[in-house]
Amino acid sequence: MARNDVVEWLLEPDQPSVRYRTLTELLHRPGSDPEVRAARAAVLRTGWAAEFLAERTPGGWWGDRSSFYTPKYLSTHWRMLVLADLGVGRETPTVARSCEVWMRGFPLKGGGVGGNSKGTGHHCVVGNMARALIRFGYEDDSRVRRSLEWLVETADPKGGWSCWGLGRNLDSWEGLGAFAAYPRARWTASMQDRVEKGAEFFLERELHRQGARYAPWYRFHYPVHYYYDLLVGLDLLTALGYGDDPRLRFALDLLRRKRRRDGRWNLDAQHPDAEGAIGRWIRAHPNRAVPLQLEAVGRPSKILTLRGLLVLDRIGE
């Protein structure tokens, strides 16, 4: 399957979210293009985004209103992170309602979003919510801006962030993710500094060299939520303009090796930590996290194929 055939596969109408993003992000069609406008409209009628929106309560949330965070990964917080990848925005009233409900459910001290019940921020939540809300069209919202400022304030001075309280690590990618989504022209000098140092943290480790080899980082998965793999790293670093850095070579070679002969990429896993001690813990607990499944494991993935092609497109392949 030649590249054009793969692109045609992504443009099939069964998943208009993928079609819309392929037209706009890979083929660089403007929003005024008739095919782009038709695909954007179709996103609300059929496919993953339409199914998500149809499952909401009238109030704009999923599941139990008492917790937008649990159960993982089926409740409001996790659904919104995925919905942000599916080509919908705040101009749709139902989406805007869910965004407002979501933001009110995670207030951050000082006026941002991503806080817990006490308003205390957690890097993974703040970064993820900021990134998703920017994709929904809230880049001018003061709450999103405050969240970005919080990410600047809480970054490690040497570069990177800590999501687990164990020091900066590759799993803590969400801060870079937020700034990768935020228009470059709006970055402040402090944002630029944090991005440059954060990117260097990943690059000096070649996106994977930290501690013992960790198998989940080499499995491409979706939904990403707050987990890391090398495709997540490549997507971030190339989107931030580091595609020509030679320290991406290992990760790019892995991306090329994982590509099927027909030009597509398989979904390696729904949830990356399904083995070892963490996997045993998940299976031993009756209230364990339930992965949110969009595509079949071991089969060609439209979402991963689009992301893989976007990475290669940014480096001129």
Where are these regions (language model features)?
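Preference for long, amphipathic alpha-helical scaffolds in soluble/luminal domains
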Residues: 1-317
